[in-house]
């Protein structure tokens, strides 16, 4: 019983922690730790389960789509941040060497000797 209660409390705590939180390295590390801990707790749960345990597990599974939506939001924020960093780096390099990406469209070769 205590494993299911711990799983429920950890899941509820994690949902509260990531809900609307801005992306940060600490949050990503907390999510990784939570997922490892949660995986261990799920592996330790053994049947038969009482009615209260079944209800708590149902509540945990009901929180799952909410957690997934928040994780998707955080993933999109990280993608956007990486894209902006890549664009800034490209702009910075274009100011340093503006002729690096020149094409040779307008050149021709003179065949006369």
Swiss-Prot record:
Keywords: Bacterial flagellum biogenesis, Chaperone, Coiled coil, Cytoplasm. It comes from the Bacteria. Its main location: cytoplasm. One of its GO terms (cellular component) is cytosol. Residues 25-91 form a coiled coil. The keyword Lyase does not apply. One of its GO terms (biological process) is bacterial-type flagellum organization. The keyword Cell membrane does not apply. It is found in: Cytoplasm, Cytosol. May act as an export chaperone for the filament capping protein FliD. Homodimer. Belongs to the bacillales FliT family. This is Flagellar protein FliT. It comes from Bacillus licheniformis (strain ATCC 14580 / DSM 13 / JCM 2505 / CCUG 7422 / NBRC 12200 / NCIMB 9375 / NCTC 10341 / NRRL NRS-1264 / Gibson 46). The gene is fliT.
């Amino acid at each position: 019983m205590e494993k299911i209660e711990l799983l429920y409390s950890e899941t509820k705590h994690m949902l509260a922690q990531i809900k609307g939180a801005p992306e940060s390295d600490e949050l990503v590390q907390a999510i990784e730790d939570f997922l490892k801990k949660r995986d261990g707790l799920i592996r330790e749960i053994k049947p038969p389960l009482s009615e209260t345990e079944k209800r708590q597990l149902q509540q945990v599974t009901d929180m799952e789509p909410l957690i997934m939506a928040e994780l998707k939001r955080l993933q999109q924020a990280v993608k956007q941040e990486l894209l902006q960093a890549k664009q800034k780096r490209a702009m910075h390099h274009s100011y340093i060497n503006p002729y690096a990406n020149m094409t040779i469209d307008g050149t021709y070769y003179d065949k006369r000797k």
